[in-house]
């Protein structure tokens, strides 16, 4: 199973016609055995305190899956290994350090137990939880892979003894993007009339989730290229969910159909939406209130060497998307994929350095758009981050700098494996 240490592979093939403009379910692996960055092997411990490693998954959705890889107990490096709860993720903890006796069954979260998958291997356990498309949860759940009671001594050549202690691996899953009363649920029925032109027309809005429920096995010719960065779930229990992107780059009028495999007949579906207007952002080519984005200013007209254009998105804001137009020198060159983020040091000498926005927000659930002809960049944040963050991109021309400062508000003011997805698909399609 060294494939778990392999790099990220994003593969999805369930429905014919899925193309690169679709975002597929994300996979998150908390690998406490094979990943050298977070393994729980005994290491040098001079403080006596337990060293904690782990991963936080913030609001997974639409068939995203989380996998825990935990070493099995043995007489060497994992002598006192303990997985808590022992049946994770079929049961879970609401506090990170409670005991097995405090575990809660998955059904208490109103997630069916079949969404939890377990597989034993010779030297490790694999536990997977699949996040359903519809849920009403406001909880943070935990599972532990605890090797902290394993202690060893390493004798060096000079006779010195070095104390080694295992680490505590912690999985934290935040589930608070719930839908109290799920909307946009459409029951799709078949039409048996030959040549039928009846259509199910669905009006779309930015960021909303559309749920298609149908009876029986189906296949589709889905091919809506106009909708870029739409996230789509694994079709489970005759339910297919689609999250619309944070922006529509053009008017949408897309038709596709579901073909009912067993009983015959088709269902025609039409998606419609208006192009997103008035995206908040900074246009550094024209005066404020004009141009592609309304909050910028013309660099040639500013009095100082630099000025800041601030944009707010996220919780409590009107939008989860922001734009930037800069046909000049842009830093980082691939804004927003890369951003300037203030690195804080204990001595107070803070400095802005280049980071991946994925790393700053601790999520891969981010939408990126770029129009080379217009020198226009757009970023969309469909999932509210765990923490509020501020990032920058700098547009420079003739000695003048326009600084776009993007403030992303939170709700609280990664290895992806084809093997894991294959396991999920094979198990769920047995039902």
From Swiss-Prot:
Residues 26-178, 278-413 form the 6-Cys domain. This is Female gametocyte surface protein P47. A lipid is attached at residue 409 (GPI-anchor amidated serine). Glycans are attached at residues 45, 239. InterPro entries: 6_CYS_dom, 6_CYS_dom_sf. It comes from the Eukaryota. Required for female fertility. Keywords: Cell membrane, Disulfide bond, Glycoprotein, GPI-anchor, Lipoprotein, Malaria, Membrane, Repeat, Signal. Disruption phenotype: Strong reduction of female fertility, while males remain unaffected. Gametes are unable to either recognize or attach to each other. It holds the Pfam family s48_45. Disulfide bonds join 30-55, 70-145, 88-143, 282-309, 326-395, 335-393. It is a lipid-anchor; GPI-anchor. GO terms for cellular component: cell surface; plasma membrane; side of membrane. Its main location: other. Residues 410-431 form a propeptide. Residues 1-20 form the signal peptide. It is found in: Cell surface; Cell membrane.
């Amino acid at each position: 199973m060294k494939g778990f240490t392999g790099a990220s592979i994003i593969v999805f093939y369930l429905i014919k016609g899925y193309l690169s403009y679709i975002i597929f379910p994300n996979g998150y692996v908390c690998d406490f055995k094979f990943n050298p960055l977070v393994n729980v092997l005994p290491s040098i411990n001079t403080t006596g305190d337990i060293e904690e490693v782990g991963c936080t998954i913030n609001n997974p959705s639409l068939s995203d899956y989380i996998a825990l890889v935990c070493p099995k107990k043995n007489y060497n490096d994992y002598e006192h290994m303990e997985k808590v709860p022992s049946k994770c993720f079929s049961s879970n903890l609401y506090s990170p350090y409670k005991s097995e006796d405090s575990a809660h069954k998955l059904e208490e979260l109103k997630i069916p137990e079949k969404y939890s998958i377990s597989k034993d291997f010779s030297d490790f356990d694999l536990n997977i939880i699949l996040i359903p498309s519809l849920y009403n949860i406001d909880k943070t759940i935990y599972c532990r892979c605890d090797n902290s009671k394993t202690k060893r001594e390493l004798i060096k050549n000079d006779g010195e003894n070095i104390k080694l202690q295992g680490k505590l691996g912690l999985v934290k899953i935040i589930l608070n993007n719930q839908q109290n009363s799920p909307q946009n649920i459409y029951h799709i029925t078949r039409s048996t009339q030959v040549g039928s032109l009846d259509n199910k027309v669905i009006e779309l809005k930015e960021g909303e989730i559309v749920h298609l429920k149908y009876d029986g096995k189906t296949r589709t010719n889905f091919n809506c290229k106009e909708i870029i960065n739409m996230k789509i779930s694994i079709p489970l229990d005759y339910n297919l969910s689609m999250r619309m992107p944070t922006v529509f780059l053009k008017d949408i009028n897309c038709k596709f159909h579901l073909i009912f495999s067993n009983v015959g007949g088709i269902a025609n579906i039409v998606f419609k939406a208006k192009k997103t207007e008035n995206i908040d952002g900074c246009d550094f080519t024209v005066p404020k209130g004009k141009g592609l984005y309304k909050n910028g200013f013309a660099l040639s007209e500013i009095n100082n060497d630099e000025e800041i254009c601030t944009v707010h998105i996220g919780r409590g804001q009107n939008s989860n998307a922001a734009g930037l137009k800069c046909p000049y020198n842009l830093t980082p060159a691939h804004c927003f994929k890369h951003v300037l983020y203030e690195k804080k040091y204990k001595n107070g000498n803070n400095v802005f350095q280049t980071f991946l926005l994925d790393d700053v927000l601790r999520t891969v659930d981010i939408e990126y758009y770029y129009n080379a002809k217009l020198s226009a960049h757009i970023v969309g944040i469909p999932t509210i981050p765990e923490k509020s963050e501020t990032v920058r991109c700098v547009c420079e021309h003739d000695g003048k700098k326009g600084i776009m400062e993007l403030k992303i508000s939170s709700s609280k003011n990664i290895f992806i494996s084809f093997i894991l997805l294959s396991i999920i698909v094979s198990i769920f399609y047995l039902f």
